[in-house]
Design a protein with these regions (language model features):
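Glycine/proline-enriched, intrinsically flexible loops and inter-domain linkers
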Residues: 1-212
Length: 212
């Protein structure tokens, strides 16, 4: 289930009504705020992808084949070490960090979840996890979006969360929608992610985009 905060009426006004005391603290004419800004229209068309089976180059020896395969796998940033990003920031600000990115005696950046305490003496806090599926997005944008949500949820399960409905997501879109077919692919991915989140009872309450 999802909370309904309001409805779009199309009358050009932003109205907040308080049912408790039957008052209307906000009744704003959007034309005075937006100043007649023309609505943008984006046009794109879906393009069927031409997908080919994975083909690895032939190597003369098994040693070369293993080395080549390892090199290709480690080029994927989701597989390689995040140390280049983790080591350059302070990971103990406020003194409330209960779980940071690095784990164990070797201080390896392999943690699935980050945990910040609410106080120095309490047993509650906030947990953060990430889900990213760029490779799957290239093959199937809708499936990739659902898998990104699933990855974030399986990562955050390492922390004892209060309830599934308490999870709020920040959706960050790194896409090139100006390329032919990419705008519609991003739209399909967003719809797939929305449908899954509605089904699970979680929601997006923020985010950013990089859509150059």
């Amino acid at each position: 289930t999802c909370e309904v905060l309001g409805e779009v009426t199309g009358d050009g006004r932003f109205v907040v009504h308080d049912e408790k005391d039957d008052t209307t603290p906000v009744d704003l004419d959007l034309a005075k705020v937006l100043g007649g800004i023309p609505q943008k229209t984006f046009t794109d068309e879906r393009r069927k992808q031409k997908l080919y089976p994975l083909a690895l180059p032939r190597c003369e020896t098994k040693k070369e084949a293993v080395a080549d395969a390892l090199y290709r796998v480690l080029q994927n940033i989701a597989v390689g070490s995040k140390r280049f990003l983790v080591n350059k920031v302070d990971r103990s600000v406020t003194g409330l960090i209960a779980q940071q990115q690095c784990c164990g005696p070797l201080h390896l950046p392999v943690s699935d979840v980050a945990v910040v305490a609410q106080s120095h003496f309490g047993l509650t806090g906030a947990a953060t996890a990430i889900g990213e599926q760029p490779i799957k997005m290239l093959i199937d944008p809708e499936a990739g979006a659902r898998m990104a949500v699933a990855e974030a949820l399986t990562n955050i399960m390492c922390a004892r969360i209060s309830a599934l409905q308490d999870i709020k997501c920040s959706a960050n879109w790194m896409w090139a929608p100006k390329l032919p077919g990419e705008g519609s692919a991003m739209y399909d991915a967003a719809c797939a992610m929305r449908d899954l989140m509605v089904l699970l009872g979680i929601a997006v309450d923020g985010g950013k985009d990089s859509l150059s």
